[in-house]
C-alpha cells in the first residue's frame, strides 16, 4: 500500500532533500508511485538534492551518496550533488555547540544549514516545493525539521521578493512541504526497503558529535 495519495502531490516540481538512502527509500518509492498514478512522470516532476556536509569524513559521505545514486536510478530520478564542505559546516553550525545533545540546538542549526542550501537551489532551478527525508527518522525532532524547513523557504522567499522588486518581477518562491514521512505505513516500508536493497545503514547521523550509542545522546 502506498503511503501517499496522488492528490497530496504538489502542483509544481518537487525537490526532495535526502539525508541518506535508508531514510529516503520509502519516500522516493511512495512519491514515484503517486506521480505515476496521477499520470505524471516522477523523473520530470521531482529530483533529489544531496546536501550533507555534516558528514564528518569524505569516505563516509561518498559511501552514503553512492547508495542514494544507486536507488534513484531505479526510478529514473535525478540526484543533484551539492558541494561537500565539512569545514564550513563546522564553522557555521558546530562552533560553540560542540557539547549540545542530539535533538538540541546544534541539530536545529544543522537542519537549517542543509535545508537553506536546498531551498536556494530549488528557487534557482524552478522547483516550487521542498521536503526532506529528515522527517522520516525517529531519531530526529519533527518540530526542529519543520522549523528549519520553514525558515529556509521563508528566507528564499524574502530574497526572491527583494530581487524581484529590484528587477521588476516577482521572483521564484519555494513552498515548504512539512509532511510527517513516518506515517501512512512508510516507517515499516522504510525498514523493508533497507533489507531488500541491502543498503549501507549507518549507525550515526553523520557529524563527529553524533557518534556513539544513540541512547547516550
Kindly give the residue locations of the regions a language model identified:
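Nucleotide-activated chemistry modules centered on ATP-dependent adenylation/adenylyltransferase
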Residues: 1-217
